[in-house]
């Protein structure tokens, strides 16, 4: 699965609220050309919503897919995190996040996050779209920690890159 996600260059947030038609599901698993049906067939995605529209000549069906539950979402993120982001300070970052959850002290977590990002090889820091790259990494990292986080959240003022909901505070993160 991790090799397929890498092959198709997809990010975790690409699977949140994915819309597709029924015809997209009819692909044999042994000849994967689209990862969404594979994730659906293997249980990583489930149907969250269904809409149908009747036209003069056809019935248009749209399915909205998403993770079936938080455990599946977190497990996939943790696998991606460990497989793709092989840096030395991941344990320290996880510990800092747990402290952040308990004490609501974002400053310490941000310091550990900076150290974490500094551990990436130079070649990873020069990807074509740095903002998208770091957006995806931060989303995957926080999701692997079990965070209540959403990507590209629309608000009255525009679209927030990430929204992290804590027990007492909501953080809007712009990258």
Functional labels for PLM-detected ranges:
Residues 1-175:
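Extended alpha-helical interface modules used as scaffolds for assembling large macromolecular complexes
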